[in-house]
């Protein structure tokens, strides 16, 4: 009898992707975060769908509709906080996933890596427009400040900002279109995820040793499905603890005040997962320069395959680059902390030093350390 999963036209695709997929036998728990990101995406789409059933994208009722969800809808408070904290878990998994890719040299699979960068940017755009929807003070002023950055683009800047706003300020038209974007973008992310997997399965997964693992592969199921399920349970446990015990720990108290265009909050800042990029933006006094630095802080990830001059794959046998890598991670944490601080001394100076360090490590220090390690191998 023919095995259905191996012959059915649809099940065959699933089988080659999740069941009989040849996988390196030594991939560690750092490889779990891809499946965790998929889980986060499903959670976000489902909770978002139920929130959209009760939310109204109108400036007069948006804030009260979110309050109505939390007070009057059955388990509305749970759905809302799962969605808000699910976004934080999403970005934690995303940062770890990218960090693992850098550490173990997964960027040599350049198509997969570049689709990953597009996914990262799309996820950031989705989170930004989503943060505007509750129409609290930080939602309104965050939208105003960040969209206004586009006015730094020469010639077309002002026109572009008014086009995005749908008027001369952030108002009803802006909120409506942001809701439309926030609804459609997760499905675009899901589509790009399939492309990401398609490219990954063309080459096969990387592994911690950085060596060719073609001679030692095992089927994805049951070994890695079980391993992924454990990761998913731990993720759900962390998400439920965060949601049920500390629902507002990652939010901003200002967002519990309805949006008021006449009253500016003392410190306008985005969600925690954007703070590193926000700190880089603020560290440059020139508006256009700041915007370029902000964009480059993400796009610079695309230079990893181009600047890779190492004879070894990954950092596991490269102590000098390993040290630089962990300095880079520490620097990112410093940038995140600075992004949440007011614009005053000494924070501005620390932010500028950390921003320069961020770019210098990727463009200068890592290629130099690679060259040094290549020469050490020859000795």
From Swiss-Prot:
Co-factor(s): heme b
Membrane topology designation: Multi-pass membrane protein
Cofactor comment: Binds 2 heme b groups non-covalently.
Main location as per UniProt: mitochondrion
GO terms under cellular component: mitochondrial inner membrane; respiratory chain complex III
Membrane-crossing residue ranges in chain numbering: 33-53, 77-98, 113-133, 178-198, 226-246, 288-308, 320-340, 347-367
Matching CDD domains: cytochrome_b_C, Cytochrome_b_N
Binding site for heme b b566: 97, 196
Keywords: Electron transport, Heme, Iron, Membrane, Metal-binding, Mitochondrion, Mitochondrion inner membrane, Respiratory chain, Transmembrane, Transmembrane helix, Transport, Ubiquinone
Keyword Isomerase: no
Binding site for a ubiquinone: 201
Residues involved in heme b b562 binding: 83, 182
Protein location: Mitochondrion inner membrane
Residue stretches in coiled coil: none
GO BP, sorted A to Z: mitochondrial electron transport, ubiquinol to cytochrome c
Sample GO molecular function, one term: metal ion binding
Role, per record: Component of the ubiquinol-cytochrome c reductase complex (complex III or cytochrome b-c1 complex) that is part of the mitochondrial respiratory chain. The b-c1 complex mediates electron transfer from ubiquinol to cytochrome c. Contributes to the generation of a proton gradient across the mitochondrial membrane that is then used for ATP synthesis.
Extra remark beyond the main annotation: Heme 1 (or BL or b562) is low-potential and absorbs at about 562 nm, and heme 2 (or BH or b566) is high-potential and absorbs at about 566 nm.
PANTHER family: CYTOCHROME B
Assembly and binders: The cytochrome bc1 complex contains 11 subunits: 3 respiratory subunits (MT-CYB, CYC1 and UQCRFS1), 2 core proteins (UQCRC1 and UQCRC2) and 6 low-molecular weight proteins (UQCRH/QCR6, UQCRB/QCR7, UQCRQ/QCR8, UQCR10/QCR9, UQCR11/QCR10 and a cleavage product of UQCRFS1). This cytochrome bc1 complex then forms a dimer.
UniProt family annotation: Belongs to the cytochrome b family.
The protein's name: Cytochrome b
């Amino acid at each position: 009898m023919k095995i259905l999963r191996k012959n059915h036209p649809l099940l065959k695709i699933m089988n080659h992707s999740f069941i009989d997929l040849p996988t390196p036998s030594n991939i560690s728990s750092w490889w779990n975060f891809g499946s965790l990101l998929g889980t986060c995406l499903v959670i976000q789409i489902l909770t978002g769908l139920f929130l959209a059933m009760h939310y109204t994208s109108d400036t007069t009722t948006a804030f009260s509709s979110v309050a109505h969800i939390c007070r009057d809808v059955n388990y509305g408070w749970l759905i809302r906080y799962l969605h808000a904290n699910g976004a934080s878990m999403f970005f934690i998994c995303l940062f770890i996933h990218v960090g693992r890719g850098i550490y173990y040299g997964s960027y040599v699979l350049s198509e997969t890596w570049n689709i990953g960068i597009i996914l990262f940017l799309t996820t950031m755009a989705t989170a930004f427009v989503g943060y505007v929807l509750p129409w609290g003070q930080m939602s309104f002023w965050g939208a105003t400040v960040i969209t206004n950055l586009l006015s730094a683009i020469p010639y077309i800047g002002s026109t572009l900002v008014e086009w995005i706003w749908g008027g001369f300020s952030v108002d009803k038209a802006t909120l409506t279109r942001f809701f439309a974007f926030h609804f459609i973008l997760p499905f675009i992310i899901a589509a790009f995820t399939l492309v990401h997997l398609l490219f990954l399965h063309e080459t096969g997964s990387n592994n911690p040793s950085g060596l060719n693992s073609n001679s030692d592969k095992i089927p994805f199921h049951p070994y890695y499905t079980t391993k992924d399920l454990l990761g998913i349970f731990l993720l759900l446990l962390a998400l439920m603890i965060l949601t049920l015990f500390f629902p507002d720990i990652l939010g901003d108290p200002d967002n519990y005040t309805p949006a008021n265009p006449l009253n500016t909050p003392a410190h306008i800042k985005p969600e925690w997962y954007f703070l590193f990029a926000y700190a880089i933006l603020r560290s440059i006094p020139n508006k256009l320069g700041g915007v370029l630095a902000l964009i480059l802080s993400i796009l610079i990830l695309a230079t990893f395959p181009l600047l890779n001059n190492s004879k070894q794959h990954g950092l596991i046998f490269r102590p000098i680059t390993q040290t630089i890598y962990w300095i880079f991670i520490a620097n990112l944490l410093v940038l995140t902390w600075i992004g949440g601080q007011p614009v005053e001394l000494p924070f501005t100076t620390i932010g500028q030093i950390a921003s320069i360090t961020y770019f210098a490590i990727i463009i200068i220090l890592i290629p130099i350390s690679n060259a040094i390690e290549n020469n050490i191998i020859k000795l």
